[in-house]
């Protein structure tokens, strides 16, 4: 046990950077958040400015301590959780990026993925990395940068350039370029990492022509990686001692550390993870096999289903369609109609993730008749989040052989009671919403705290996992299956849309 009172979690997300201070009882003392720019150079392309990621994240760290009136010497450790797969390449000497960060949602590398498939790499990638061939993962993004920034591949071979996911980039900046590391959970999302041998995979590096010299060292999710100075020169040196990709951090924050426990996070995308313990379960149903954290941050495996558009489809209603002025209004408008009037929205704006994995699917609205109004479309958009979650859960139960009795949920959209009730209805299972919604930050804080003895073990934290509300199914099985079959019909029609274009 340390005499320091607080842990800081840095939660670097897709649309904002956050810092959260927690005390020993896992209470949230203070939160600071800053949004940053989304860059869309072409349709289907998504970028961030790595310097803006760093600027927003470092300023929230200073801000959150000031807000809580806490001095840096009261902080026991810092944990980091991050948007996964997003790829950054920078100069070792200057710490300057050679290109913008290519974000996980970006589809520009679809052609590179097609070539990997043509070269017969699909099965190898599946069995070695646990992933499917898709532009979502970091490997093809790094290749794209090296292919398009002149002279960069040669510089990378000479050790002048470094690659990292967002966790690696932040730690490099926080340690003034002294530490170049990532953790197993983030490495498992690159398509360059052998999840069984726990090492970078030479065959994948060769296939994508990525020099090994630019890759970070891979470490456990809970250990001291280095120190950062808060308050400039002569400030306090604080250990950075926890790293996990956002979804694995949420799984840990929900204390799903035993085989068969699962959670679904409703953020920009929707991510369901089920802990499968020490065995890597190969999916026959389009899910990913990935690395998660055991009770001490050690390597466990998980099955994951990723849905690209969840909260992002509500933002689409607000920003592009102008049907709502605030995301919170979606619940109000959805409940003004008794159903969707036969409408299904398939929000395949950047293709579809699990279990379809079709980068060429595109968004569509089906079942429109003259009586359909904006409330029906708002409701159908919310319902699409629950339908996509059922797609993933069905695949997960088939792969694992485990029937889920309750789903733990977290993320921004779980505040929407309509969505949570519909989710329970369409799954036919209990949905449990925790009291503390910041489970991603919680996971990063737990990992950091365990590494420095702030908490001795997870047993100390079990009683803190309080369920605020439980949703139970309120519709009959026949009704549930009827609605779901309509969804399946709609999805089928949205698949493989784009590749027919000239």
UniProtKB/Swiss-Prot annotation:
Annotated residues for binding of glycerol: 84-85, 136, 246-247
One Pfam family, short name: FGGY_C
Residues binding ATP, per UniProt: 14-16, 268, 311, 315, 412
Listed pathway(s): Polyol metabolism; glycerol degradation via glycerol kinase pathway; sn-glycerol 3-phosphate from glycerol: step 1/1
Catalytic activity: glycerol + ATP = sn-glycerol 3-phosphate + ADP + H(+)
Keyword flag Ribosomal protein: no
Activity regulation as described: Activity of this regulatory enzyme is affected by several metabolites. Allosterically and non-competitively inhibited by fructose 1,6-bisphosphate (FBP) and unphosphorylated phosphocarrier protein EIIA-Glc (III-Glc), an integral component of the bacterial phosphotransferase (PTS) system.
Gene Ontology MF terms: ATP binding; glycerol kinase activity; metal ion binding
GO biological process: glycerol catabolic process; glycerol metabolic process; glycerol-3-phosphate metabolic process
Binding positions (ADP): 14, 18, 268, 311, 412, 416
GO CC annotations on file: cytosol
EC code(s) of this entry: 2.7.1.30
Keyword Nucleotide-binding attributed: yes
SUPFAM superfamilies per the UniProt record, alphabetical: Actin-like ATPase domain
The entry's keywords: Allosteric enzyme, ATP-binding, Glycerol metabolism, Kinase, Metal-binding, Nucleotide-binding, Transferase, Zinc
Binding residues annotated for sn-glycerol 3-phosphate, in chain numbering: 14, 84-85, 136, 246
Enzyme class: transferase
InterPro entries in alphabetical order: ATPase_NBD, Carb_kinase_FGGY, Carb_kinase_FGGY_CS, FGGY_C, FGGY_N, Glycerol_kin
Function per UniProt: Key enzyme in the regulation of glycerol uptake and metabolism. Catalyzes the phosphorylation of glycerol to yield sn-glycerol 3-phosphate.
Quaternary organization: Homotetramer and homodimer (in equilibrium). Heterodimer with EIIA-Glc. Binds 1 zinc ion per glycerol kinase EIIA-Glc dimer. The zinc ion is important for dimerization.
Similarity-based family: Belongs to the FGGY kinase family.
Name of the featured protein: Glycerol kinase
Taxonomic source organism: Enterobacter sp. (strain 638)
Gene for this chain: glpK
